[in-house]
Amino acid sequence: MTETRRLRILITNDDGIKAKGISLLISLLREADFADLYVVAPLEEQSGRSMAFSLVEPTALEPFDYPQRVQEAWAVTGTPVDCVKLAIGELFKENALDLILSGINNGKNSGRCLYYSATVGAIREANLHGIPAIALSQSENIAFFQKAHMASLIRSLCEFTVAYKHTDPLGLNVNFPASTDDSPWKGIRFTLSGNEFLFGIPRLVRTEGNRRYYTLYDMRDKVSEEFSEEYLALANNYISAAPLVSKNTPRATLSEEELAFLKDSFEQSVLWKASLNLEEDLA
């Protein structure tokens, strides 16, 4: 019997290499035990940096003694996109990666928040280099994450994303719901992102002479009258998996044929077999 080749997975994030979310993701991947894990993540938090990278100032890369067993780990004094660029162009230029994961982010990345998210920015960068990738985010707070059965689900997500062959490398944006009443997650849903987004309200924190300092961390939801599939899935306690598009087309989206092929592939995969029918919930 032929032994299945272990995947080579790069893990990054935007909350920083010491964040709880990336540690949780690594523990789940280690539990599933199907891949060799490499970590290249920012030394400090980089939330909201989108696809920004260090164009002028040098970026430092140094080995990092990660507390869990991984093949190798490095910390970067830059953004998640810096991490991906350094991984692809320097660290693994002679030994290609199979997949790049970003997360698990502390807070959701859905709707139009994708334009701001550095968690998602890393995935778009991976796709531009021809590498399949997945962004993973936990709504509200990483404390809401439910570990039961998630190691096998994340393995299925990874294997599906690597195996998916169509026109471009696949990028998935996965969001886990926040179950404030501790009710178990119901399954996973293939969705499309909508127009919902978080906007920051300027808050004056101090004044020094003529200079005023503000924060934009007070985030509020703005929801359109017609809820998106992604929004409804999360609201109904389902994990959402939405495709990301990195190619530059006039529509800046998947064609109807590409979307139908991807949706059909997803629904027939091991992911969908483990999920529940959402038609009544999302009608």
UniProtKB/Swiss-Prot annotation:
It comes from Chlamydia trachomatis serovar D (strain ATCC VR-885 / DSM 19411 / UW-3/Cx). NCBIfam families: PRK00346.2-3, surE. A divalent metal cation binds at residues 14-15, 47, 105. Gene3D superfamilies: Survival protein SurE-like phosphatase/nucleotidase. This is 5'-nucleotidase SurE. It catalyses: a ribonucleoside 5'-phosphate + H2O = a ribonucleoside + phosphate. It is found in: Cytoplasm. Its cofactor is a divalent metal cation. Nucleotidase that shows phosphatase activity on nucleoside 5'-monophosphates. The keyword Metal-binding applies. HAMAP family: SurE. One of its GO terms (cellular component) is cytoplasm. It holds the Pfam family SurE. Binds 1 divalent metal cation per subunit. PANTHER family: 5'-NUCLEOTIDASE SURE, 5'_3'-NUCLEOTIDASE SURE. Belongs to the SurE nucleotidase family. The gene is surE. Coiled coil: none annotated. Keywords: Cytoplasm, Hydrolase, Metal-binding, Nucleotide-binding. GO terms for molecular function: 3'-nucleotidase activity; 5'-nucleotidase activity; exopolyphosphatase activity; metal ion binding; nucleotide binding. Its EC number is 3.1.3.5. Signal peptide: none annotated.
